[in-house]
């Protein structure tokens, strides 16, 4: 399913729609505009007043997390029960039984489907949010980068929902703008990046949704897959979703070994978990450095130096 703004962009850039299965008509209303403005204003206040920093960070968390819940697939929810040998056979015969794992000689973990599932989440909210994010990233690449910069002067390394890591043939983006398009770029720059003519404008636009800003600058990057990359330079920056950064010795070689050997790497997680009225310590080995990247077409050359 495509939202109409994204579909219009696809058609404008040459994609031909040959079949339409269903159309859902709606009346566009900016129902969350006040909430978005409130979050942006609170974050701006947190930038200028140290006493309001915690409010800015709290609103950042709210803005980044509130739409994700609406995309939850409740049909995949399961009920987990722990039982002994005497009760496991009764659970297996239950029509809602899905699978059983033996934890030790006397304890079994049984997974059951829920008897009733209430599908009451507004899925269209998550659909619009994520597809608008997709539209912003497409516009940034094709309408800005690919228009104003020669493809020999930049190369995308990895991309996420709201960020893109790329290599440039110069020290800054302005230096690789096509000479014949520099005047046009300066006149349209404010549509993509925060204004730089005055400090107060830059501070205000820093928290304006839809504008891009430089998040990191370094010497290189090892990008394995989504949320698994290592940037190195004056100050290193890395991401390893699902792996505890404090418990594992993570450096450039951790990612390079996966890239060169084509074998996923593991990490260790340790912590406490509450089960019923008991607190248990756990030690988990997890494959957090994956080599496989199936979401996008990747370059045949693993290394580009």
Q: Where are the model-predicted features located?
A:
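Conserved acidic
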Residues: 1-305
